[in-house]
Amino acid sequence: MSFQIRVFTAILAVLSLFTAPVLAQNSGPLRIEITEGVIEPLPFALPVFEAETADAADVAAQITQVIAADLTGTGLFRQIEPDAFISTVSSFAAPIQYADWKAINAQALITGAVAVQGNQLNVKFRLYDVFSGAEMGDGLQFSATPDGWRRMAHKVADAVYSRITGEGGYFDSRVVYVSETGTKDARQKRLAIMDYDGANVKYLTDSSSIVLAPRFSPDGQRILYTSYETGFPRIYVLDVTSLQRRGLESQEGTMSFAPRFAPDGQTIVFSLSQGGNTDIYRMNVNGGSATRLTSAPSIETAPSYSPDGTQIVFESDRSGSQQLYVMPANGGEARRISFGPGRYGTPVWSPRGDLVAFTKQNAGRFHIGVMRLDGSEERLLTASFLDEGPTWSPNGRVIMFSRETQGAQGRATLYSVDITGRNLRPVRTPEGGSDPSWSPLQR
């Protein structure tokens, strides 16, 4: 059984929400073991990438550190400390002494080299299966300007993750969120964007008005969000590169909010309140008339498309309490999918199409959870004073959300967790953070 198949089988088992804990069924030594629901991370060796030019030493070390952080941050990989190395990789082209790496129980070995040539940074890497004594696939090379070194590191980590698990990675992605300062009764909010790991934070709006619910377009180039700058909620479209923005058409006396793109990138759905009623509407992102999709005498909000664009999941209190429903993308009969105790909200469809993530309030606690599209196999992943606003990683294996602490200060912090409820981790931001939206992989 190949390295990829052995490891991927085990990873799928630990990441599967719907299988009992198992032990990876293979006799080979290269595997991730799962015993009684506990994962044994894959040990890997990562020597500092070789500097092929004199001015590349510092950036080579930085790239190596980011790759290690990406992989270990998943909870699926464990880095072997360099002090344990028996031999070093003298150059990128040098033959690999597999016995030395096997002796320290490394199951994977990652080597690489970095060169700076004028205004171009070149990064190349190779991945080796230590126990079979073979390279996994061909080496890859990425190029960018020197200030793009973090993206190059994320691209290498994505490639390693993909080759070992057989699934796409999520490291070369970004997150837009609401940056928050001040106390609860005087909170200032502005849009911010960052790398998935909290690096390279940039602010997209000022704090002169409240902003809510930023949502990426499918290509990651535009952001929908709600702003109160006119005194009532209105939806805006922001270009990520130019920072140019425009407000969507709105009628006097209406409030529009909770926007989200359809998979085609041209259609949006949102909630619109008028005449005491709140329903879900659809319109072209470039403007035009809006089509009403729901008409129940209740509050209908937080719509999210299925990956194929044929269905919409949303929240509604039409049954008397806040619950989740699925309807055709063109409107029509909706079916309820949440039936547990408590209230459900902020549903978002997994990019894999198999699950819906949601916020649940029950017995004085808030949870982030997932369920299947028929409402079965609900699992709560977190619990705290206030967890809300889930968003999916590009590969559908990790969820980011915001958590607010109790008290007058009530600082909101971003967290991530995998779909089994393991590997709960804070995402560091300069200020408080809420309402995240995860981009697709960058191009």
Swiss-Prot record:
Record-linked Gene3D superfamilies: TolB, C-terminal domain, TolB, N-terminal domain
GN (gene name): tolB
Record keywords, A-Z: Cell cycle, Cell division, Periplasm, Signal
Protein name, as recorded: Tol-Pal system protein TolB
Signal sequence, start to end: 1-24
Domain of life, per lineage: Bacteria
Database matches in NCBIfam families: propeller_TolB
GO biological process: one example: cell division
Protein family per UniProt: Belongs to the TolB family.
Known function: Part of the Tol-Pal system, which plays a role in outer membrane invagination during cell division and is important for maintaining outer membrane integrity.
Assembly and binders: The Tol-Pal system is composed of five core proteins: the inner membrane proteins TolA, TolQ and TolR, the periplasmic protein TolB and the outer membrane protein Pal. They form a network linking the inner and outer membranes and the peptidoglycan layer.
UniProt xrefs under PANTHER family: PROTEIN TOLB, PROTEIN TOLB HOMOLOG
